Amino acid sequence: MSLADQVLAVNDDLPIRTDKPVHSGKVRSVYWLTEEDSQRLIKEKGYDVAPDAPLAIMVISDRISAFDCIWRGEGNLKGVPGKGAALNAISNHWFKLFKDNGLADSHILDIPHPFVWIVQKARPVMIEAICRQYITGSMWRAYANGEREFCGIEMPEGLEKDKKLPELLITPSTKGILKGIPGVPEADDVNITRNNIEDNFAAFNFTQASDIAHYEKLLKEGFNVISQALANVDQTFVDTKFEFGYVNDAQGKEKLIYMDEVGTPDSSRIWDTQEYNKGNIVENSKEGFRQFLLNYFPDADILLNKERMPEREALARDNELPLDSLMSLSRTYLDIAAKITGAEIVLSENPKQEIIDVLRADYGLID
């Protein structure tokens, strides 16, 4: 079987029984189960959710997204071998660690296959909850250009690129385009302040104002749990993005939970600690691939300038990247997953057929 066959590039065409349109995101696809199947699985599997909670099958792909575009490699390689399984394995590991440390639950109820989560429907908080321990990336670029206020936080003078910040910072941005919020531009992924959130907590989907402090607590605690665990395997947790939402438990009580993925090479920057101590930045995250793209194309501004999105989309559509760039990224994902979880990721020969087989045999979701 070829390398391209081992990659799950298309994940929105599985014959999973559903009566709603399949939601196809950049990397994951979501299949909302019928009311009948949701209630049957809750009863059969004993999930700790309300009896009428809507459930979904979330299938990750091996597609690689960067700068809001999907990229592909030579030889019809439409993804990164092992990427999907590595991301899910890392998130599963952190969610378990969060639970062991008494933090909040996640939306995941079951893991039928390395590419698949069964999740309960959550009401998302409309915030990209970003936590930063080092000044790098967009924060450093803004700081180097003279900006001293970031998401309403006053930054001190004398900070240096890639160095540890005086304290862990929360620098939130909008999740999607939010309309009608005073002082918040109607655009995706714009920086916001804590005051923006406090003054408009309902518009950001918080149930009550006190939940703002709760999400910040869960964000910092989750960051610290991951940071300490990564330090044990000589990795430095630089910054990350969390997402949160609300669900009801089996007793109907609403609770704030972690959503999406956490502490992965896609949602975080992770540096090799030994190299960092020598003055070198070695990325064990997707950031290394982003840097490759910036160096590979002559006009990096196309990738950084949101006004040039049509040119960027054409760049991704019309270019096959060198095979070694995607294979190098594959090694990054597989190696960091093994370091974090303590187990090697085994590449599937035919992931799509495996998913179909397990969802038919063990969950009765495929006719």
UniProtKB/Swiss-Prot annotation:
The GO annotation for biological process reads: 'de novo' IMP biosynthetic process
UniProt pathway annotation: Purine metabolism; IMP biosynthesis via de novo pathway; 5-amino-1-(5-phospho-D-ribosyl)imidazole-4-carboxamide from 5-amino-1-(5-phospho-D-ribosyl)imidazole-4-carboxylate: step 1/2
Q: Which GO terms describe its cellular component?
A: cytoplasm
MF annotations from Gene Ontology: ATP binding; phosphoribosylaminoimidazolesuccinocarboxamide synthase activity
* Domain of life the protein comes from: Bacteria
Q: Which protein family is named in the record?
A: Belongs to the SAICAR synthetase family.
Top EC class for this record: ligase
Q: Which reaction does it catalyse?
A: 5-amino-1-(5-phospho-D-ribosyl)imidazole-4-carboxylate + L-aspartate + ATP = (2S)-2-[5-amino-1-(5-phospho-beta-D-ribosyl)imidazole-4-carboxamido]succinate + ADP + phosphate + 2 H(+)
EC numbers listed for it are 6.3.2.6
CDD domains documented for this protein = SAICAR_synt_Sc
Tell me which species this is from. Answer: Vibrio atlanticus (strain LGP32) (Vibrio splendidus (strain Mel32))
Q: Entry's InterPro entries?
A: SAICAR_synt/ADE2_N, SAICAR_synthase_Vibrio-typ
This one is known as Phosphoribosylaminoimidazole-succinocarboxamide synthase
Q: Which keywords are on file for this protein?
A: ATP-binding, Ligase, Nucleotide-binding, Purine biosynthesis
Q: Which residues form the signal peptide?
A: none
Which SUPFAM superfamilies does this UniProt record tie to the protein?
A: SAICAR synthase-like
Q: Indicate yes or no for the key word Secreted.
A: no
